[in-house]
Amino acid sequence: MTDLAARLARPGPMTAVELRPPRRGLDTARSMDFWIDMYHAVQRFARQGTFVLLTDDAAGDAEEESLAHLAANLGDGSDFGTVVPFLTCKHPLEYCRMFARRAAALGTAGVAVVG
């Protein structure tokens, strides 16, 4: 049982946080600032044991691909066990499979598939 499944099975309230990557098309400086803030937030929440639900175009806005950025910039040794990336079914099947493989390789708590 994953940490997320175990936590969901326990009685009592649970706190989780949803974060969204920046919209595509931001200028470079604004996009970099956004990602730096997001990395710090994910690291802080991971240290606290708070699950982070990380959307990726889930709201229909064109957003940058979150999983690739996190893998590249959080660094080796980062705990992805509290990160739950969202995957929307609007992507081609091969992309969905690749996304799930990458999420598993990072050690994420799971993948939320939305439709």
Regions found by a protein language model. Give the residues of each.
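Active-site beta->alpha loop and helix N-cap motifs at the rims of alpha/beta catalytic domains
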Residues: 2-115
